[in-house]
Amino acid sequence: MTESKNSFNAKSTLQVGEKSYDYYALSAVPGMEKLPYSLKVLGENLLRTEDGANITEEHIEAIANWDASADPSIEIQFTPARVLMQDFTGVPCVVDLATMREAVKTLGGDPDKVNPLNPAEMVIDHSVIVEAFGRPDALEKNVEIEYERNEERYQFLRWGSEAFSNFRVVPPGTGIVHQVNIEYLARVVFDNDGLAYPDTCIGTDSHTTMENGLGILGWGVGGIEAEAAMLGQPVSMLIPRVVGFKLTGEIPVGVTATDVVLTITEMLRDHGVVQKFVEFYGNGVKSVPLANRATIGNMSPEFGSTCAMFPIDEETIKYLRLTGRPEEQIALVEAYAKAQGMWLEQDAPEAEYSEYLELDLSTVVPSIAGPKRPQDRILLSEAKEQFREDLKAYTNDPVQVDQSIPAKRMANEGGFQPGSTSDLDNYNASWPGEGESAAANAEGRPSNPVTVVSPQGGEYTIDHGMVAIASITSCTNTSNPSVMIGAGLIARKAAEKGLKSKPWVKTICAPGSQVVDGYYQRADLWKDLEALGFYLSGFGCTTCIGNSGPLPEEISEAINEHDLAATAVLSGNRNFEGRISPDVKMNYLASPIMVIAYAIAGTMDFDFENEALGQDQDGNDVFLKDIWPSTEEIEETIQAAISRELYEADYADVFKGDKQWQELDIPSGKTFEWDENSTYIRKAPYFDGMTAEPQPVTDIENARVLAKLGDSVTTDHISPASSIKPGTPAAQYLDAHGVERQDYNSLGSRRGNHEVMMRGTFANIRLQNQLVDIAGGYTRDFTQEGGPQAFIYDACVNYKEAGIPLVVLAGKEYGTGSSRDWAAKGTNLLGVRAVITESFERIHRSNLIGMGVVPLQFPEGESHESLGLDGTETFDITGLTALNEGTTPKTVKVTATKENGEKVEFDAVVRIDTPGEADYFRHGGILQYVLRQMAAS
């Protein structure tokens, strides 16, 4: 770390017990003491990294004199202490770093310079798919299949962990990156050779903000920005507005942390917090357990903020002690936070914020969210009514007026034989479910009942609204003992009364760390969960990222043949269309406790207040209230089952891995030996033909529209992580390279191969490209007579051969969701030069610039609809060449010429927001910029 210029004489000494530390005291700079907590962390960062060039005295004073009411305008350079990765985004990062080593050498530089300068840590959590479920060996089977599919990727990552310094990998089967981060990796305060400073961390996953609950400033970035940060490049940003979110009151009985976070998500998304920090304050904060704070922080991308910060206090210290952090580290965290004014003191003067919101926690009520956005909160008491209303958008089937619709039969179709078993023999709780029906009480809603014969020979009926997947999944909730213990206890009470999950429900339990398995064992809750089909399925992201695995064949066939609007209920953070399963249309976020309840109900068309879940052994109706665990029961179980020793044991050898990981055959050497036949790992093309000096920026001429899209297009829509559909360009590529269909794996797992990923860009099965009348990865190919429909990738190949650049048109909130750098990489490799939208989500806008694609916005109040653009026009964009002169134009002129010669002209806003971003764009991307700097030095 370069020594700070220390213009304010801020370097001081902190004595903690018998050990002393150097630190940069905020008290040396007048004004710092009044700042919100999150800006104090930024202020310290600038004090410590002041170099007189990129970070100057003026930048530090700008933070200290922050005007809460002003719009962001002052650029600063933020240097995170570490970088966090998961394997889907991490594999392409390591591919890029390996490629950069060769490129630096080609440009005359030293390849050994390509090493992380600050700690970079990866947790492999995105690759496990729930193939096996509802059986005792589900975990073993899923891990076995995971290694078979991903051996090549895992060999590459193990090579990277040895070839690069300052880079560590947590092996598969350990947990989810964000849960492992808060339970083990997070430092809260760093001790770097006796220099103490706040732990700050950016990650290649948008839910990196989970660490905000621990008082750690950080957020998700694209993989390309993370790579630059690893190599010493600071994160360019504007000093943000900070939204103060005041918490008062206490959470009432019967309300979960999930209910609180869904309420906060709805409030903040409605308020508008994109590009802003959110900070929680008020006396209610002290009543929010650390696990709940982490859950709230985790959902920051869903409400759109850069981060969602909680300050450090006694609750933080209690959590660090519980999770097994060394006492010396805990003492440093407390002493440092108090010395820097970063400790939450009750009744201390409130900081000034840019905007204010307030929530009385006592007013929160049980909720779920869906069917396609996390911010679409539904009161549990109104869930049935809202489902019936939303269902109309997913089916044209008529509303049922009575119970007279006969169920269609699916027996013996598609080669399925009653009594036979699949290779994995997946049957929910091993019972046939004779006579069960998801079409019961269907009067008043669309209904299309289908009778399915189970493998055991029993019959049951499915219908619109059937819960096809009930999944306890995701770090968002599995990191929270109160809701996880609650799920186990409701399962216990349900099992005691003879209730079961419905036979058509795929039941999944995939916690975010092995600690959950430990306390479930201690509390003897596994037998109760297993009685309802919730066997341990894996330690990883699973359902939350679409790794739900296939539904049983007979159920999948029935859903697809009869176009049923099946649903999934998950304890995750995202429920975008097409994300959870290709067989499921409607997705709902809920607490783990409600996941159990919906598995028993078997349908979203259910009123938990007034409808019985079933009958007990004596024939008495059993309602949700009869099996809901009390707060006292949950707390008593937590106290008995969870201890510091549990965390210490599970994290003692966290980097060691299982036998399969240890026995992987890995290559040696500092540069990677690329295999041209590999379908997983290919040398990245971004530096091919790169010169020592950047080429001039050019205007865009005669561009065609690749896609015309609506609002809330997610990075899932742009670059799905889901399974690869046979017959698509990605599948055709794998077929041509001898990959069997069952070995396609997911697009997310193949992010180390740009050939697959290019073909998978804009290939989401739910993408609605308004140029065509079909959902999926299609467009019109205007290089052909009449502009016929074609796969997007195939059209792009033709456009490239014809030398025609491309643009994308879209509506509001373009690029929402995951911090998926491949959504920008794929866009670039397909030949897209500009994306024109009404608004962008933060991370994707930054990623586009990082890949040399210019983000543009329609004039305020305008859209492609209001301007009458139908996507058949040719586009000219002029004014970009001003970037060659060192200035960033505020707007550029866009001329869209229709087929009849009519022109539509408008001034698009250039969303290159900082001088640093302009530098990246001039160089063709952030990695090219960093590479040229390395080669030059």
Swiss-Prot record:
Where are the stretches annotated Disordered?
410-450
Enzyme Commission designation: 4.2.1.3, 4.2.1.99
Keyword Glycosyltransferase annotated: no
EC class, as a word, reads lyase
Which Gene Ontology MF annotations are present?
Answer: 2-methylisocitrate dehydratase activity; 4 iron, 4 sulfur cluster binding; aconitate hydratase activity; metal ion binding; mRNA 3'-UTR binding; mRNA binding
Quick check: keyword Iron in the entry? yes
Kindly give the Pfam families that the UniProt entry links to this protein.
Aconitase, Aconitase_C
* Cofactor details (free text): Binds 1 [4Fe-4S] cluster per subunit.
Record keywords, A-Z: Iron, Iron-sulfur, Lyase, Metal-binding, RNA-binding, Tricarboxylic acid cycle
Please give the pathway this protein is involved in: Carbohydrate metabolism; tricarboxylic acid cycle; isocitrate from oxaloacetate: step 2/2; Organic acid metabolism; propanoate degradation
- Where along this sequence does the record place binding of [4Fe-4S] cluster? 475, 541, 544
Fetch the Gene3D superfamilies from UniProt: 6.10.190.10, Aconitase, domain 3, Aconitase, domain 4
Top-level taxon of origin? Bacteria
Gene Ontology terms describing biological process: propionate metabolic process, methylcitrate cycle; tricarboxylic acid cycle
Which stretches does UniProt call biased (Polar residues)?
418-429
Q: Which reaction does it catalyse?
A: citrate = D-threo-isocitrate; (2S,3R)-3-hydroxybutane-1,2,3-tricarboxylate = 2-methyl-cis-aconitate + H2O
Q: For bias kind Low complexity, which ranges apply?
A: 433-444
Concerning its family, UniProt says: Belongs to the aconitase/IPM isomerase family.
Q: How does it assemble?
A: Monomer.
Cited function: Involved in the catabolism of short chain fatty acids (SCFA) via the tricarboxylic acid (TCA)(acetyl degradation route) and probably via the 2-methylcitrate cycle I (propionate degradation route). Catalyzes the reversible isomerization of citrate to isocitrate via cis-aconitate. Could catalyze the hydration of 2-methyl-cis-aconitate to yield (2R,3S)-2-methylisocitrate. The apo form of AcnA functions as a RNA-binding regulatory protein.
Q: What is this protein called?
A: Aconitate hydratase A
Recorded source organism is Corynebacterium efficiens (strain DSM 44549 / YS-314 / AJ 12310 / JCM 11189 / NBRC 100395)
Q: Which gene encodes it?
A: acn
